[in-house]
Structures are given as structure tokens and as C-alpha cells.
Amino acid sequence: MPFLPGKMPKPAVCRRPATSFHADLAGGSRYLYWKHNATPSPHPRRPRVFRVQGDTAMDWQGLRFLGESPVDGYVLQNCTYSPSLVALAFLVACLAGYTALDMVERVGNSLSHPRLWQWIGAFCLGSGIWATHFVAMLAFHAPIALRYDLPITGLSLLIAVAASYLTMYMTARPRFGLLPCLLAACCIGLGIAAMHYTGMAAMRSVATQYYQPSLFALSVLIAIGAAFTALAAVPYLRGRRSARYRYMKLIASLLLAGAIAAMHFTGMAALVLSVPAGTPLELQASADSLRLGWLTGVLASAIAACGIWAAWSEKQRERRLSENSRVNALLNQLDHAHASLRQMARYDSLTGLQNRTAFNEVFVQHLENCRLRGKGLAVMFLDLDHFKRINDSLGHDSGDQLLKIVSERIRSVLRDSDVVARFAGDEFCVLADLTQDHEAHILSQRLMQKMKEPIALDGRTLVMTASVGVSLYPNDGEQCEELLKNAGLALHQSKACGRNNAQFFSRQLLVRATQELQMEEELRQALRDDQLELHYQPILALADGEVHQLEALVRWRHPTQGLLGPDRFIGLAEANGMIDQLDDWVLRRACRDLRSLHLAGHERLRVAVNCCASNLGRASLVDEVRHALEQAGLAACFLELEVTEDALMYNIDQTIPLLERLRELGVSLSIDDFGTGYSSLAYLRRLPLDALKVDRSFIMDIPASQRDMEIAQAIIAMAQKLHLKVVAEGVETPQQLAFLRENHCELVQGYLFSRPLPLAALEEFLRAYRFDAAPPLRSLNQA
């Protein structure tokens, strides 16, 4: 068979019967051949193969695809194959298909060099297709000598690699749908066919090759169809690690190998070899072909194995990179979280100012710098006046907005070297370097003046004031803690002086603070050790002169300072959260003492107990009163609770329901120190009250003060119009008593009748009073 273009040799003509079969059994050959003579037949049968002679034949490299049956020659049939090489060829195809799918997966998932993996996959698949063809051709045994043209064989390899690359390129698309899959299947299917028939063109022998058109077309369709089925699994191989992943990949590789093998052997089934007449036919030695086939198969398998190993190594590398990236991402997140936590730990999230933690660190550095340079330093506490009222009335969002505005204003006043921090709520702290002490006074005034500028907030215009406390280094301390403490004492003094002012630390403040701290500790100890006691001041009725009621007044018998009045420790108890415990003790002790007086024969006596503002904010007050009465065995009608105007007005909407519950319990209610606080007559008529107590400040200057007399008269008249009893406090002279009697005041108390007395002295007073008939009242009645 000629391989290069040119004129084909004319087959020899044999003079034999029209048609006959011959078996050449020389050397044990089982090859059959079919002879045609040159005598034309009047009824020619339909040709089974392609015609050799004539210009109508399609001739390329000695291959005939179209034409009539060959004449005057032999057609070789029933050529055999080496089973081991056929199996090896299929194994090579499987490895090539598996490697190609592995590369497809790499191209889709690779983090780097996807084009390189396309070329590696194309070479592995193309060389595998070519090796499958070549090993299968070496497995082909024909009774003629066969050899292969090297350039054309190399061309078939290039065709296989090129088709494989185009297929790899198509499958690398992110969206590999039905149409791209069909195009890729056509590409690889046609590439396999082109490689096969180009490789067949490289085969050289005395025979002429003919192809049956139907089988030829079927081989191409089989290659495309099987490739399409295999490539349809590509989308499922990307990013999938399910239980069926490996099975799907194996099945797809078998389908791709089947496409290669099916195309090859279908193409071989379409092949018909025709030899010239008289050509000797003998079985060729197959040992060399077998060795060459195995060598080729092993090399191709090694190439595929290297591709699989490379893909596996890349997977491991990318897995390590992915793990490292994940770890690095976690570390970055941790760093970011650490930075965020550090930011949150050092800076106020609302205003962006430093918080106490960061301020303390900066304070140490500032103080050390001032110490080295010999300069002064001012520590200022700034607290907004009545900020809680803003939160309660406008809401916390408005309060937060106000704090942002205030922080910006403080920044605008300070220098770049100064430091400002937000400690808590509406409290700010400033560090300012000083050359002279009077600069601190100037700065504090500038801060206070800046705070007074109008603020537009939620459609309102607000004017805020601030209290400032200042301590100076080195005059007021040389340590951070000491300077902060002293500035806090100065701020406390500023609030005590009416707010909206600046106070500088002095040693007297420290002495007072030390005393208050000691008093606080001793008061707690007094509550635990029962060092408190109640004194009772009688309240008399002007109508009959009888003692109708007692006011319970707490006293503290201090171990070193003696008997202390409530003005010495009530404020301390309120400031340190002990007032609730103190009021509860007074209530229980007063109920118990009154019960003992009832048992002593004073059954009509009632007792009045003071109730602080914080107690009116507790819903448990009613239960505490009920428990104290039950524990003492006392009826509720004998108890009266006294509250101040300020306590009532502090939270009037919550106070009114609480007072109504106390009235339902049977407890009487009165307003203590009436006229000294702020109240509204509209609220006064809504309150469930029984009595008003005129403060002693309106009684003490009667009759010298005409204004006080008019105020007292107005209060008494108003109470009578509201059907409330009136109790006048601080009655100390007969003139005051006469004035109250003339204005129809019902009840009086004061030093004119008795000082507050302990229980034992009170019992003596009641016994003596019963028989003495109250000299002041008796003389007044006689007059």
C-alpha cells in the first residue's frame, strides 16, 4: 500500500472462476480473502467496498472512502487482535479519561495557573488517545507486513493533543451548559476520529485501504455520543465532595475511554484491505508488536499517572494553601477583633473620647512629663447639671446626641496637647498642662461658658450648665489617684454649692470627705448593731389639749460624738444607699413602740413616720408597711406617713397610685414641711392626703414677721378648703400658739410643749401630762 500521494499500482488479474473463496493456511494462517475477477457481469451486484480504479475514488494517502468494490485483488477479512494489547489499550484510554477529568476539575478549581493545567490535561488526554490507537493497532494482526510513517504518526498525535486542548478550553468555562457540552463533545469526538484516520493513513503495506461509509459515519457518531455522555458529568465534578463524587468520576472516565475505544474498533470494522493478486500472504511475527505495544501502553499509563499525581499534588498544595488562608483569615479576624476590642476597651463608643482605662495610661505619661519639665498640670472633672432630666423627658437617644455635642464643645476649647475623656454618663475629665495655676481658672470658666451656648436638639433649644471640680499638680497631689480623688471632691463641692460653678480642691474638702467616709462606715455599723433609737415629739389638739399623735424622729447615739440628730446622717444615708434600710427600721420600731404605748393605756395615740423620696419609687413599700403593722399587731388607722413636697413631685404619676394603695390599706398621709418645696395645686387636689404640716420656718418669726403670718394664714385656709387637717410645727412661744388658735389650726407641736423624747421619757411625759392639763393650753383657754 503506497503512503505518499501518487499513482496506485494496478492490481494483477487472475484467470479464475468468477467468484471463489480461498484459504491460505500456510504457516497456520486463518486469514480469509475474497477474489474478484475482471470479467464484467451483465447483472453486477451492489458493491460492498470502494472501487480502486478510476478518477471517481476519493484518494488521500492511499485511503479510499468513496467508490466501487476493488477489482482483480484480494479483500482481507477476519484479521485478529491480541487480547492483552486490546485490554492494555482500553486501560490506557481509561487512565487518559480519568486524568483528563481530573485536569478539568483542576482547571475549574485551581487557585493558580489554570492555563497550565489545560495544557497538561490536553497532553495527557491527547497522548492517551493516541497511545490507545497505537497500542490497538499493534494488537491488529494481518497476513501482510505493516509499517508506519513517522511524520504522519506524529501528526496524528498533534491532532489528538489539539482536539484535547480545545475540549479542555471549552470545559473550563464557568457555566458549562448543554450547548457548550455538545460543542466540546463534537470537538473531542471529531478529534478522536481525525486522529484515528490520520493514524490509519500512516500505516504502510502492500494492501489498499477501503472504508465502509456506514461504519465510518457510525464510528464518528459513537465518539461524539460517548464523549457527550462523559462530559455531561463535568459540572458535577467541580466543588463536589459527596459520597457519589468518586463513582461519578470513574463512570465518566469509563465513558470517555469507551468513546475512544468504540470509535477505534468501529473504525477498524469499517476498514477493508485489498492486496494485489499473487501477493504472498503469511502471518507476521507478533512478538515485536507485542513488546512495542506494551512499551507504548506503559509509557502512556506513566504519563497519565504523572498527570494524576500532579493533580493530586496540586490538590494537596491548594488544600494546604486553603487551610493556611483559612488560618490566616481567622488570624486576621482575631487581629481585627483584638483591635476592635482594644478600641472598645480604650475609647468611648458614643463620643469617640478616651475612656477611663486609656485616660489612666495617658495620665501617667503626662504626669511624668510634667514632673521632668517642672510644669504644672490641672485635672478637671466636668459634670452636666440635670442631665438625667434630659434623658427622662426627651429620651436616651436625645441624651446621647447631647453628649456628642458636649464632647465636641469640650474638644473645641482645649488645646492639642490637652486630653479629654468620658468617664461615665455625663462626667468628663480633662488634663491640661499649666505654666501658672491661674490658667486652670481661665480654662474652667471657658468650659463653663461654652456649655451655656444654646443647643438645638429635637426641635428644642436647650441651655446646659456644668459643674467643674479642679485639682492641681503638684499643689494638690503628686500621684494620679490622689489628683483624681481630689478633683472628684472639688466636683462634689461644686454640686453642693448649687451647681453651675467651678470649685478648686482645698484641704478642708479632704478633711470633710474623710469624716463623711468614716461616718458612712459607722452608720452601717450602727444599723447592724442597733445603735439607732427613736424619739417622739407629741402633737396636741388645740380643741381639747389632748396628745392625739406622735412624730417619730430618728436619733443616732454615736459612740464618740453622742446623740446625733437626723440632719447629721440622713443625707449621708441617702447618698450611700442606706436610706431604704433606715426607713424600714424606723417604720418597724415606731409601730412596735406605739403598740407598747397602747398596751400601757394610751389607746388613742397615733404615730407619724417620715417617708423619703426613694421609698415612694418602690412598689414594695405597701407590702413593707403591711408587714410592719402585722408584725407589731397594730391597726393601719394608727399609722400616718409623712412625705415632703419634693418627694411627691419627683415622680407624681407613679406616686399617686402608690399613695392610693396606702390609703386603701388604712394608712393616713400628710405633706411634711409644706411650703418649702415646689408643688402644684392641680396635683395637690388629686393626692389622697389627710393633713398638711406647716413648716417651722413660717412659724418661728411669728408675730414679728407679718409676711410669715400671712403665709401661715393662707396655708391654713387652703387646707381647710381642701378638707385637710393642719399641723403647725415649731411652736415655741405662747404668741405663736395664740395666732394659730385664732386661725383655727387644729394640731400643734413644738418645744413649747415638749422636745422629742425617747420612749421611756415619753411614757413619763404622758403620765404627767394627763394630770397636769397642759399649762400653756390652760392659760390660753383662761385668757
Curated annotation (Swiss-Prot):
This protein's record includes keyword Transmembrane: yes
Catalytic function, reaction form: 3',3'-c-di-GMP + H2O = 5'-phosphoguanylyl(3'->5')guanosine + H(+)
Disruption phenotype: Inactivation of the gene impairs biofilm dispersion upon exposure to NO but not dispersion in response to glutamate. Disruption of the gene does not cause a biofilm-related phenotype under standard conditions. Mutants exhibit an intermediate virulence phenotype.
Membrane-related topology note: Multi-pass membrane protein
Record: residues binding Mg(2+) 1: 551, 610, 642, 672
E.C. numbers: 3.1.4.52
All residue ranges annotated as the MHYT domain in the record: 81-274
Free-text remark on how the cofactor is bound: Binds 2 Mg(2+) ions per subunit.
Protein's UniProt keywords contain Iron: no
All ranges on the Cytoplasmic side of the membrane: 313-783
Principal location class: membrane
One term under GO cellular component: plasma membrane
GO BP of this protein: cellular response to nitric oxide; regulation of single-species biofilm formation
Protein localization: Cell inner membrane
The name this protein goes by in its record: Cyclic di-GMP phosphodiesterase NbdA
Organism of provenance: Pseudomonas aeruginosa (strain ATCC 15692 / DSM 22644 / CIP 104116 / JCM 14847 / LMG 12228 / 1C / PRS 101 / PAO1)
Taxonomic lineage of the native organism: Bacteria, Pseudomonadati, Pseudomonadota, Gammaproteobacteria, Pseudomonadales
Gene that produces this protein: nbdA
